């Protein structure tokens, strides 16, 4: 056992532990998720999210990223899924398998992949839907805040959401989430199918929301390069397990992450898609 020159009193240890816990907003402790009592998707996933941080969750298709978000937000039940083992702690209270409306009222809001608006409502009407969990509260100020981050929405606020472009739809669903005053925002593949210029703008806004609103964000994203540029911390998932974690800057420099998710060789040169073999990734980590 290594010698430690410092000795702490029990009171000091308690205070240090409390300070550390107070910095954590969310903890997943060894959770497993099963669909239809048959298909196990998550196998002992543990992660921690500090307040006011952006945490990126990386991994290939089918790794379990979206299921992790749905376990947090309570959206497993509509898909006949449930957390069978482990605990999910939010503000130090257990929330696993709670009703999604209860979790939403606690301040956890998920922006689902796919950008599904109410097509026959206007953009502004769609945004007002985001206030459904806080009836009686004024919303005009919140609309102004959303338009501050997404000025393109204000220009078209009376137009039907069904006529929005992909980028406008992504802004709309993120704006609708902001209307609910999230403490923890779960973003699932915000860059999916968008042009590179739009992707850069979306990620710039995500960073601003984190910095200016103090919103804690978990970001599930295939675009690992962009995700790790704005994240504070990251986790890599493979086959329902966490196989790697670390500060974002450390993950950007990790040889495995560079090869399998950033498409870079050890020498720093770009690799073609055919050179990045998924079986090599699985063999190395599993």
Residue ranges and their predicted role:
Residues 58-60:
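The feature captures the beta-strand-to-loop junction immediately N-terminal to the Walker
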Residues 73:
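Helix-to-loop junction immediately C-terminal to a conserved catalytic motif
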Residues 77, 82-84, 91-115, 140-143, ...:
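ABC ATPase NBD coupling module
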Residues 179-183:
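A short, proline-enriched helix->beta-strand linker immediately N-terminal to the Walker B motif
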Residues 200-214:
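Helical segment within the ABC ATPase nucleotide-binding domain
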Residues 263-286:
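ABC ATPase nucleotide-binding domains
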């Amino acid at each position: 056992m290594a010698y430690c020159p410092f000795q702490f009193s029990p009171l000091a240890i308690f205070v240090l532990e409390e300070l550390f816990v107070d910095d954590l907003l969310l903890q997943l402790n060894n959770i497993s998720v099963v669909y239809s009592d048959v298909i196990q998707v998550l196998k002992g996933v543990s992660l921690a999210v500090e307040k006011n941080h952006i945490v990126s969750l990386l991994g290939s298709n089918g790794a379990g990223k979206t299921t992790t978000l749905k376990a947090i937000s309570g959206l497993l039940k509509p898909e006949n899924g449930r957390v069978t083992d482990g605990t999910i702690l939010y503000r130090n209270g257990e929330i696993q398998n709670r009703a999604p409306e209860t979790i939403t009222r606690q301040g956890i809001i998920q922006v689902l992949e796919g950008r599904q608006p109410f097509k026959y409502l206007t953009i502004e009407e769609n945004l007002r839907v985001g206030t459904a969990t806080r009836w009686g509260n004024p919303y005009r100020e919140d609309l102004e805040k959303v338009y501050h981050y997404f000025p393109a929405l204000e220009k078209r606020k009376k137009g039907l959401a069904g006529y929005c472009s992909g980028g406008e739809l992504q802004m709309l669903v993120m704006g609708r989430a902001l209307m609910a005053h999230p403490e923890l925002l779960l973003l699932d593949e915000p860059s999916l199918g968008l042009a590179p210029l739009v992707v850069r703008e979306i990620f710039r806004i995500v960073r601003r929301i984190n910095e200016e609103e103090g919103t804690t964000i978990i970001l599930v994203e295939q675009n690992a390069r962009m995700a790790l540029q704005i994240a504070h911390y990251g986790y890599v998932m493979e086959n329902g397990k966490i196989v790697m974690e670390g500060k974002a800057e450390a993950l950007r420099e990790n040889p495995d992450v560079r090869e399998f998710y950033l498409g870079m060789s050890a020498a720093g040169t770009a690799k073609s898609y055919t050179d990045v073999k998924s079986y090599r990734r699985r063999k190395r980590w599993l």
